[in-house]
Structure formats: C-alpha cells, structure tokens
Amino acid sequence: MTQILEVTAREILDSRGNPTVEVDVYTESGAIGRAAVPSGASTGTREALELRDKKSKRYGGKGVAQAVKNVNEIIAPLIIGMDAADQAAVDLAMLDEDGTENKSKLGANAILGVSLATARAAADAFGFPLYRYLGGVAGQTLPLPMMNIINGGEHAANNLDIQEFMIIPKGAKTAAEAVRMGAEVFANLKAILKKGGHATAVGDEGGFAPDLDTNEEAFKCIMDAIKAAGYKAGKDIVLAIDAAASEFCVKGKYELKGEGKSLTTTQMIDYYEEMISKYPIVSIEDGLAEGDWDGWGEMTQRLGSIQLVGDDIFVTNPSIFRKGIEKGVGNSILVKLNQIGSLTETLQTIDLAKRYGYTTVISHRSGETEDTFISDLAVAVNAGQIKTGSLSRTDRVAKYNQLIRIEEDLGRAASFGTPFDKITDSKK
C-alpha cells in the first residue's frame, strides 16, 4: 500500500519569484504526496547546501534544474520500491547517496523535497491528515504564532537594522482567535503608518517595511497599533524580535547603521536590555552573530529570563545544537526544515531540544510557497510556537489558515497553550 511507485520533481517559483524544487511522490495505492521547498535570505553559513545552477543564464543563475535532475535521475531510482512509511530509511538512503556533510552533491533542496513529499504520500495512503500521521494521537497542541508585522534587515529595503519585529497574541485561547488578534493589530498598524506618512508596502514576509528613523520607533508604532486594536500590550499581546545579528556584525562589531551606532558584544546586550525594560519583549532570536559563542554565553546569563532563540548559530543541525547545549547557549531553537535538509534530521533536532529543556519554534523562510507542511509539523511535535510571517501574502496566510483547519479537525482534543505566561507574569 505504501510502496513508492513514482517520484517526479519540477521547477516552480517561490514567493520572491525565484525557482525552487517541488516533488511528487506516488505510492502503489494511488496515494500522492507533494512538497515544495522554501529558501532563506539571511542564512547561516553552516546550513545544508541549496543547489542552484549558478553557471547558467536561466533565472540569473538561480535556477534549480540540476536539483530537479538529481531527483528525477538519481533519487527516484534509488527509492522507488521502498516503503514511504519508513521515513528514516528513505531519508538515510538519500543521505548515503549524497555522502557529503552539507548535502552538496544532490542538494538539500532536492533531498528535502523528496523527504517531505514521502511523508505526505504515506499520510495520504493511510488516510490520515499530515499532523496526525507525523505526531500520532499525541499531536494536539496548536502553536502560538509569532507574527512578523514590521520587516527590516535583509527582508526589506529600509534602514531598520533589526530584521523582524513580531507580535505574539499570548492572550488568545485558540489558534483562530490568535490569527484574528494578529490581523486586527496588523490592520491598525497600517492605518498608523499611513497617518504618519510612511509607506505601507510589505517585505518578503508580509510585514510592513517603513523607513523609520530607529528600531525603537518600530516598537512604538506596534505598541500604538496594539492599543488601537483594543488590546493591552504585555497582557494580551507581547513582542519578539529576530535581530539576525550576523547580518550587521562586521569585524566583531555590531553596526546599527540606521542609528549610527557601532557596538561591542556587551554594548549590544546592553541595547537589548534597555529595549526589554521599555517594551514587553519576551523573545529575541539571533541577538548576536552565529560565530559569537562567548557573546551568546554572556547574553544567556544576562537575558536568560526571556526566550533566546538560536537560528543561524544552530541551523537546525543536531551536532551543532548539541555543542550549544553543552555550552549553555540560548534556551530555544528555531527549526527550519531546509537548514538541515531532511525530515528525519529535523525530528532528531526537535527531540534533542525537548530532552534538554529548550523551547522549539517551527519556522518558515523568507522565500516561501503555498506549502503548509510546517503548520502540520508544529502541531505534530507539540512545538508550542510557530513563526510564519505576517497577516498578508498568500504564502504566509496559507500556514495560518491550515492551523485553523487543524484546530477545527481536532475539535475538543485541541489545546492552545503559551510558553510566555511565566515571563510576562514576572514583568507585571
């Protein structure tokens, strides 16, 4: 029933108009699984390799024809006849065939597309929704969304150094209510920005990309939007940021060009400390550069009462993450499927986080598609948090809509907790 019968890959476009890989996996029962691979803009240097046709003129060298060819001509013959329900075996076969540490032979985009499509095909063969197939009866926690409503850094053409300014509707009782609260704040933010004479064009992840004078001005606009929407900041809605500090770390200094500041590691932590004292910030992602391990240790000691999320520093890699655990760096990990390049390795990283008390945030990438795999994954592993952009652009909203459907499907079995009650209670 779940024996793999056919594997087909193609080149499609992502939300930035760049090519990406889409894969279909068919089983002997007629089941089909389809998956599209996302792509990042601010990327960790140790991420699995996204194979692109750099020497070709097609798509300005960004094509993925070679990755597609690798699926159709190398991976397909390798896994046809295997059991789609044996995810680990399928993934291991591809990893062995690739044989490189960063998946540079076949391409992480080729391997991941097949990996995710295989899981979907198996779920379809058994007649289960994806979240149920991946998580069994235990997967029933809807994740609290971290909504990126102002974009800066590599995600927008403005002078904001911080890449993402996010709201977290921690006062919501359901996923549907969380989405509504976020949408209401987003709508009010648009009105506030318009009134202030700012552009309301959106960035890669659907958030507004105004050319504000300082990072703090972004916080002020968001606080005003929360109030205008009828909510209380710190109680109903809290704040989070993704600094993506590797992008503005130059020769060991943190260059906040928008504010004309050049800061040492300690001064950068001081900067965050000041912002935390002024605003209900409960989570900071990539507050320091990926190579600043000593700085991360200092930041964890000083700011460890809030959530400190490692993205570029951990890159969803179990071995690198284990190093961070041993050093006591951060207290949370951002999980991006394409950073490591297979579902099996992603699940290993999530399991490691749970065993060592790190929180888990399932995340999209800035270059996305309509694929909603991460919504099902977040519920399946009871991650408790998801980061999938703003309340605009179909590539972002598709994930929120899928969470609403899953919540409806779970019915009374659905739960919706928040990992931030303890943090915000201590700030009252």
UniProtKB/Swiss-Prot annotation:
Its EC number is 4.2.1.11. Binds a second Mg(2+) ion via substrate during catalysis. GO terms for biological process: glycolytic process. It catalyses: (2R)-2-phosphoglycerate = phosphoenolpyruvate + H2O. Pfam families: Enolase_C, Enolase_N. Its cofactor is Mg(2+). It comes from the Bacteria. Pathway: Carbohydrate degradation; glycolysis; pyruvate from D-glyceraldehyde 3-phosphate: step 4/5. Catalyzes the reversible conversion of 2-phosphoglycerate (2-PG) into phosphoenolpyruvate (PEP). It is essential for the degradation of carbohydrates via glycolysis. This is Enolase. It comes from Desulfatibacillum aliphaticivorans. The lineage of its organism: Bacteria, Pseudomonadati, Thermodesulfobacteriota, Desulfobacteria, Desulfobacterales. The gene is eno.
